[in-house]
A protein has these predicted regions:
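C-terminal lid/capping helical subdomain adjacent to the catalytic/cofactor pocket in oxidative enzymes
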Residues: 122-180
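Short, charged, low-complexity patches
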Residues: 84, 88, 157-160
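Mid-domain catalytic core of redox enzymes
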Residues: 1-67, 72-81, 98, 177-180
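A short pocket-lining beta-strand/turn micro-motif at the edge of beta-sheets
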Residues: 65-67, 104-106, 137-141
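FAD-binding beta-loop-beta segment adjacent to the flavin cofactor pocket
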Residues: 40, 51-62, 111-143, 147
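Short, solvent-exposed loop/turn segments at secondary-structure boundaries
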Residues: 79-83, 153-155
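Flavin (FAD/FMN) cofactor-binding core of flavoprotein oxidoreductases
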Residues: 73-76, 88-136
Length: 180
């Protein structure tokens, strides 16, 4: 997969107020279903989530809106072989079609993450259940991460917290780690 980060002047987005930008529109991002046939699969309006990002503009210049576009579904490896400029132009064109943003981005960055997202296959939930049962039989052991309940940051944080609670409770009961 690749993340294409695009920076636009706030005024490039129709309806965005000079003082409020995309946040004033109530936009945070969107997902694109595979059946739509688009390269971009998800868009996050980063300056809505992290308003301080709008302050990266030159002092006195118009604030920027930072947008992250995710591309690269399973089977789309050839898409990721395109040059950075081509990926940025493609993401910008699809963003314009979806949002009406005007003009080209003033800056962009392409970050590639080959093999970054696990592609769960049929039977994944059953395998996870078996793993969790086997791990539960080993006191003090826990598993977490994108391989289990989801690849998104919230899912990873949730599994990490659950694993931390399991291990902490084990340690609080006064048991020691066993090696062997």
């Amino acid at each position: 997969m690749a993340i294409i980060t695009l920076a636009y002047p706030r005024s490039a987005f129709p309806g965005a107020s000079p003082g409020g930008g995309l946040a004033a529109l109530g936009w945070s991002g969107y997902l694109v279903p595979a059946v739509d046939g688009r390269a971009v699969k998800a868009v996050t309006f980063s300056t809505v989530t992290w308003p301080h990002l709008a302050d990266v503009a030159v002092p006195g210049a118009e604030p920027l809106e930072i947008v992250r576009c995710s591309v690269g579904r399973i089977g789309e490896e050839s898409l990721l072989q395109r040059a950075d400029e081509d990926l940025a132009a493609l993401a910008a064109a699809e963003l314009a079609a979806a949002t009406g943003v005007r003009g080209a981005p003033v800056a962009h960055r392409v970050s590639r993450w080959g093999g970054a997202l696990p592609q769960y296959t049929v039977g994944h939930l059953d395998r996870v259940a078996r793993i969790r049962a086997a791990v539960a039989a080993q006191p003090g052991l826990a598993v977490c991460g994108a391989a289990y309940e989801g690849v998104g940051i919230p899912a990873c944080i949730a599994t990490a917290r659950a694993a931390a609670v399991q291990v902490t409770e084990y340690l609080r009961r006064g048991r020691q780690w066993s090696h062997g």
